[in-house]
């Protein structure tokens, strides 16, 4: 409670990653969007702590990077740069020629999605190691998250 400082709720969850992972997958951080607290792979009502069953985010592929967010999407590494469309609850791969860095490396800002170069020197085999900026272009193609 912001006026009293009292704890309003607590919650525990299985984040579906083994303890002591070897590639950062155990270090994912929460994201707040409007009245939702998203703690991968689940989401909660920020005011009550009630689990929102419609959210059950499952990254496909390698997912060591931390999430970032806009008002309508989550962004993260799922092998490649990936967008999770909150309204549709669908994944959309942004590109397949690169991978974002292992920290918060996909920045939605001003209608663009920016991915600063953060993979050079990595042993992953992706062709493009450069900073990129993406503009919206029509209806995105999506894939199921289940």
Predicted region positions:
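Aromatic (tryptophan-biased) beta-strands that constitute blades/sheets of beta-rich domains
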Residues: 1-21, 48-63, 87-97, 102, ...
């Amino acid at each position: 409670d912001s006026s009293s400082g009292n704890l309003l709720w607590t919650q525990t969850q299985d984040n579906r990653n083994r303890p002591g992972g070897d590639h950062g997958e155990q270090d994912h951080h929460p994201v707040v969007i409007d009245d939702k607290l998203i703690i991968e792979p689940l989401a909660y009502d920020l005011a009550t702590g009630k689990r929102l069953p419609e959210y059950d985010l499952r990254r496909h592929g390698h997912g060591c990077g931390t999430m970032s967010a806009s008002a309508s999407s989550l962004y993260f590494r799922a092998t490649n740069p990936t967008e999770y469309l909150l309204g549709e609850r669908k994944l959309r791969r942004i590109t397949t020629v690169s991978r974002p860095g292992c920290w918060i490396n996909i920045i939605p800002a001003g209608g663009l999605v920016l991915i600063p170069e953060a993979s050079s020197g990595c042993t992953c085999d992706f062709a493009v190691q450069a900073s990129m900026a993406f503009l919206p272009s029509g209806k995105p193609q999506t894939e199921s998250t289940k």
